[in-house]
Amino acid sequence: MRFFALFIYRPVATILIAAAITLCGILGFRLLPVAPLPQVDFPVIMVSASLPGASPETMASSVATPLERSLGRIAGVNEMTSSSSLGSTRIILEFNFDRDINGAARDVQAAINAAQSLLPGGMPSRPTYRKANPSDAPIMILTLTSESWSQGKLYDFASTQLAQTIAQIDGVGDVDVGGSSLPAVRVGLNPQALFNQGVSLDEVREAIDSANVRRPQGAIEDSVHRWQIQTNDELKTAAEYQPLIIHYNNGAAVRLGDVASVTDSVQDVRNAGMTNAKPAILLMIRKLPEANIIQTVDGIRAKLPELRAMIPAAIDLQIAQDRSPTIRASLQEVEETLAISVALVIMVVFLFLRSGRATLIPAVAVPVSLIGTFAAMYLCGFSLNNLSLMALTIATGFVVDDAIVVLENIARHLEAGMKPLQAALQGTREVGFTVISMSLSLVAVFLPLLLMGGLPGRLLREFAVTLSVAIGISLVVSLTLTPMMCGWMLKSSKPRTQPRKRGVGRLLVALQQGYGTSLKWVLNHTRLVGVVFLGTVALNIWLYIAIPKTFFPEQDTGVLMGGIQADQSISFQAMRGKLQDFMKIIRDDPAVNNVTGFTGGSRVNSGMMFITLKPRGERKETAQQIIDRLRVKLAKEPGARLFLMAVQDIRVGGRQANASYQYTLLSDSLAALREWEPKIRKALSALPQLADVNFDQQDNGAEMNLIYDRDTMSRLGIDVQAANSLLNNAFGQRQISTIYQPMNQYKVVMEVDPRYSQDISALEKMFVINRDGKAIPLSYFAQWRPANAPLSVNHQGLSAASTIAFNLPTGTSLSQATEAINRTMTQLGVPPTVRGSFSGTAQVFQQTMNSQLILIVAAIATVYIVLGILYESYVHPLTILSTLPSAGVGALLALELFNAPFSLIALIGIMLLIGIVKKNAIMMVDFALEAQRSGGLTPAQAIFQACLLRFRPIMMTTLAALFGALPLVLSGGDGSELRQPLGITIVGGLVMSQLLTLYTTPVVYLFFDRLRLRFSRKNSKPVVEI
């Protein structure tokens, strides 16, 4: 009582406290970073190693395995996967959430150093690592095009100058340059000319390497001067290499230009990049795992004028893709939704109270509570994101509830003729405990969320804390500022025997009278209500089992990502044509704004595309509808498939896959994996619950298998090393020397001229110089036959792995897809030697499914404990919690009605309903208990009077919460996929709960009261006179 009086009778102090909360909130709001979602990126590090010309199996056994054994000892590694292809190996390390990325990087470098002695010789460089997730979509893509510059020269400028500058920007984790490769001097050998001159390929290689050296020459000095010695020991251009003498034939010099074409070209000619219809160099920028995407993009954009200033006039630099506009638009939509929710809630209050002065009080209390929350968010290191702003939107209904309960009770005393300050003090005292109970029990709902681990826990933590802080501030405001404003702003009125009967007042009176009549009937037919209550409990269980489930709603971020998978024996020239064909199909779609793509590198039969859609206001279709439309057109392209998926703000795992979800097959036997993977793939491809089924196990590439006759080789004086060196020199794009320039280092690349290696007959032209100096054709000691070979070898941990990726057809949920996969694996009878498990987002979904019921039960148990402590009763909390089944039924039915699967966002809605709907029961139970204690009423009389007396505040608080959530349901535009499931769940639960709990709660109250009396009679002891 004295606590409330302190603030009611000291208005200046109360106003200044509220002003201080508001000012701190405004300052926090200005300092808060902006993001699409809370920070939930796993720390990921990618290790890369190369050995040009090495087969995928060689890379896996000699490079990947030693590195994996060393890297696998690092603490905190969640998952280690590797992919080895022609000449390259890439290992992805995903760490625990609590692992510091910089500390993990130091451990990775130490592990690489430890494995260095086990790696093969001939590697052009040591393995390197990058602190970025290669499976993440780039946050920004820049393109370089030019009418006069070659692709190699553009690539050199991009990688040497632009990429280095961009990588220094805060938040940038990796700048991947694609579309070509570094400039190089390429030596294309003529096998017939070499044979005629009697020159071996090794001799050419050694001559070039010896002619291009960079060694210190020292200095000469006398007593006065010092001269630095400089020689022309380096050859830097193709023109300088052409006259190089590589051999003498009968005293005549054989020059390099006589037996080879020497050109200024690029290191790897099997690379191509495009933007729309033009050749381009792509700079794909990814952020650090812990970086903020908006701040990073803003930093890049701020650097663009400087970058453009350093670019020659012949180069055009453009932004091909930027993830930030849709994020900003989504947050703007949430902010508008928040403003609409506040306005609707204030309107509800005005309609019920029909007083401008009375409405002004919650109109002040709500902004103070919401704005003050920003200060706490800043102190906690949170951001302004979709979830935290949705928490504030939902909090609008909660924070006004506290003010409504206090305000309505004070208004009731004023209508009875009590003086304002006395009414404020008396009214606050009566409902103070009720408001505290409602707020504490609501905050208790979120305690299990704060203890939840993994990605879901990280994702929901900001939502839970933000909402809890807003409720806490609202509690303080409703018990301090609200009664003070009521005491000083509202006026008492003469007691009336009847309330006004105009407009909404007449409707409320009619509703209250109708409710009273129906409640009397219900209290006389409690068994029927009991059956209805038990029916809702059973219906809850059935609906939860039956409803389709997913991890997170599919977002429309305005960006699509596509992976091209062509025939495994396709050539680079044909693959480049496929890229152009696919880009034309997509570019012609009316919803597409920009298309970029590239192909080549170590995987000739694959490519990547990034598609920017037009803003939501300029297109009618969602991203998924556009994918469905394009899928039909793309399927007509022969020899290759393009798999499209909408880029999501959450992508789990480090695997690069051509679809959103993955199912991984593991085995310690590569033979068993290769036997069962095609069978499983065929069975899964036939499932209607899956779309775009594809795989990364590519073991049908074309291979030419050479079989040496070792006896013949020994007789001819040829060893295996010389034969292998011949093949590497001829067909491996072998980097044989380095050209040092001020800005970068470039390579001399040697191979047989492509004109002489267009078919298998090229092998017949190859020869080896034996120990006697004679040229021995390869066909003398080797036979060759075509065979199948893997284009890549994949590992997870140290086991052979194959990942099957899939998307979901429209109308299919992730739960339906995972159930179909598990059922199919059981039907196939896959042996124990081949293990299957979901990975990435599908794996997190499985883990979340297992913990959802536990989380809901934990929330209910926590609320029960808090209510039990507050009421000092085991029974009354059960009465209050009896409101939950009806809310659950309403929420699940609403999701079914809107064809929305049960996701993590819907789970948040269920948790919120646990806190919202029990408020009705708290208000009823509080007044019923008070009526029994002070009024001497029977339980039936007390609960009946409490229901009628609290009908108006119950309607006000329910409608306030409902109207606070309604804008989430009706919202469109960017980010609506996240907001709508939350609004649907809350609105559906509130409507059903309001219809049923007004009747079930009084019946449950009386049931437990009778049960308590029976229990007390059985345990009562007879009085014994002594």
From Swiss-Prot:
Main location: membrane
Transmembrane segments: 15-35, 333-353, 360-380, 387-407, 431-451, 463-483, 528-548, 853-873, 897-917, 953-973, 984-1004
UniProt GO cellular component terms: plasma membrane
Keyword tags: Cell inner membrane, Cell membrane, Membrane, Transmembrane, Transmembrane helix, Transport
Protein family (similarity comment): Belongs to the resistance-nodulation-cell division (RND) (TC 2.A.6) family. MdtC subfamily.
Matching PANTHER family: MULTIDRUG RESISTANCE PROTEIN MDTC, PTHR32063
Name assigned to this protein: Multidrug resistance protein MdtC
